[in-house]
Amino acid sequence: MKLSALHQSYLNRRSNSFRSPTSLDSSVDGSGKSLIAVFWLILHCLCCLISLVLGFRFSRLVFFFLFSTSSTNLYSLPFRPDLPVKHLDVHTIGRTLDPGANGTTVVATATKSSRVVVGRHGIRIRPWPHPNPVEVMKAHQIIGRVQKEQKMIFGMKSSKMVIAVTPTYVRTFQALHLTGVMHSLMLVPYDLVWIVVEAGGATNETGLIIAKSGLRTIHVGIDQRMPNTWEDRSKLEVFMRLQALRVVREEKLDGIVMFADDSNMHSMELFDEIQNVKWFGTVSVGILAHSGNAEEMVLSMEKRKEMEKEEEEESSSLPVQGPACNSTDQLIGWHIFNTLPYAGKSAVYIDDVAAVLPQKLEWSGFVLNSRLLWEEAENKPEWVKDFGSLNENEGVESPLSLLKDPSMVEPLGSCGRQVLLWWLRVEARADSKFPPGWIIDPPLEITVAAKRTPWPDVPPEPPTKKKDQMPLSQGNTVVVIPKQQQHPTKIRKPKRKSKKSKHEPRPTDTTTQVYSSSSKHQERN
C-alpha cells in the first residue's frame, strides 16, 4: 500500500511538472496572438482605405465614360469618314449698358457653353467672365491709394522739383528726339520745369513740339547756329547748358538740376534716385557708340580675339561712364569710356558714317542742387565755385569745373552700379529733307495706287468719233485719217534674210501717218 501510494504521488508530481511549462507557453501564445490580431486589423483598415480611394477614383472614371462620351466623343478616330463632323459654335456675350443713378451697370447674358476634345479629356469652354467696370475702377483706385500711402511712408518725405535742361536745334531728327524726352518727362511724378535752349534762335517749330507736353517750359534761344562737326557741337552745347544754368540762377528755381539731352534715353528710376542728392551727385551712363556703316562695325573673329587680348592685358573696359567706389561706397575715381578701339575711326562731321564718341565726362551723368547756383544760399558748401564769376571761355568741359574739390561728389544709383540712362547720338544727313514740324501740307501725291481705288483726277473720256474716222494725236494736234486708208494689222512672220532683199527697194506708201510719243502711249494702253 505504501509503495502504491508513493508511486501515485510520484506520478502526480511528474504530471504537475509537465503542466507548468504548458501554462507558460499558453500565456506567451496569448500575447503573440493579440499582437498579430492588432497588426492584421491595421492592415485591414489600410486596405479598406486604399480600396475606398481607388474605388472612388474608378467610379469617377466610369461615371465620366458613361455620361460624357456621347457628347465629347473621346475615343473617336480623327480620320474616320463615317462619323459626322461637328463644328464648334462660339457664342458671344451680349452686353447691355443700363445707365443708373450711381453709374453704369453691365448686364451680361451668356449662352450655353460648348465642349472641345483634346486628347483623352474634354475641355469645357465657358463664357468670358466680364467684370463690372465700376468695380474694376474702384479696385484700381484702391491700389493707387495703397501705392501712394506706401510711397509716403517708405519713400521721400519731401520731394524736390526737377529742373531738366535740354539743348536742341532744328534738324531732321529733332521731333523724334524731343518727343522721346518729352514723354519721359511727362511721366515724372514730381514737379518739373523744362528749360529748352535752342541754337539759331527760338523757333515756332520747336515751341510747338514742347507745348504739347503740358509741362512748365522755358524756351531760350541763342544766336549761334549749331556747327556741323561733333567737336564744335559739343562745345556749343556746353555753352547752351551754361545759359540754362544762368536762367536757374536769375529765376531762383529751387530743385534738382539734371541735363536731359534730347537724344538720350532715361529710366524712370533716375528721377527717383536724384531725389536723394544733397548738393552734387553723379550716376552711371551707358555709352552706345554706333556707326551708320554696318560693314565697318562687323569685325572678323581674329580681330575680335586680338582686341579682347589687348583689353585683358591693359584693363577690361565697359561702355559705361560713371563713379567708381570702394567697398565702403566711397568715391575713389571715375569710369571713362575707352576710345582706343575707335582711334582714327570716329566721326568728325555730323553726317559721317562712323562711330560717334562721347566726351571725357558727359553732362548727362551729373545732377546738382539749384541752390549751388544762387548768389546767396543758406548752408552753401565752400567746395563749390561761385557760378557768377565763372568764365565760359576758360574751357568748362564738365560739371566738375563748377567744384573746387571733385571728391565731394555723391555717387547715386547704388554707388554707380545701376545704369539709369543711356547716351546715344543718332543724326541724319545734313542735306536730308523733311517737312517742317513733320506736318504733311499739302498732301503727298500718290506713288502707287491702292487696289480697287481709282486714280484721282481721272481725265474725261474722249468724245466718240465716226466709224469711218480714227484720230491720231501729236502733242496738241489731232490728225484724222480716213478709214479707207487704214491698213489692217498683219502678223509678221519670220523671213529668211537674203542678199536680194537688201538691194530691193521697199514700196512707198502714199498714206501719211503721224507718230508721236503720246500716240504710242495711247496705243499701248
Swiss-Prot record:
Gene Ontology cellular component terms for the protein in this record: endosome; Golgi apparatus; Golgi membrane; Golgi trans cisterna; trans-Golgi network
Catalytic activity: [(1->4)-beta-D-xylan](n) + UDP-alpha-D-xylose = [(1->4)-beta-D-xylan](n+1) + UDP + H(+)
Keyword Magnesium: no
Lumenal side of membrane: 57-525
InterPro entries, per database record: Glyco_trans_43 (IPR005027), Nucleotide-diphossugar_trans (IPR029044)
Keywords in alphabetical order: Cell wall biogenesis/degradation, Glycoprotein, Glycosyltransferase, Golgi apparatus, Membrane, Signal-anchor, Transferase, Transmembrane, Transmembrane helix
GO molecular function: 1,4-beta-D-xylan synthase activity; galactosylgalactosylxylosylprotein 3-beta-glucuronosyltransferase activity; xylosyltransferase activity
Subcellular location: Golgi apparatus membrane
Keyword Cytoplasm tagged: no
Protein name per its UniProtKB record: Beta-1,4-xylosyltransferase IRX14
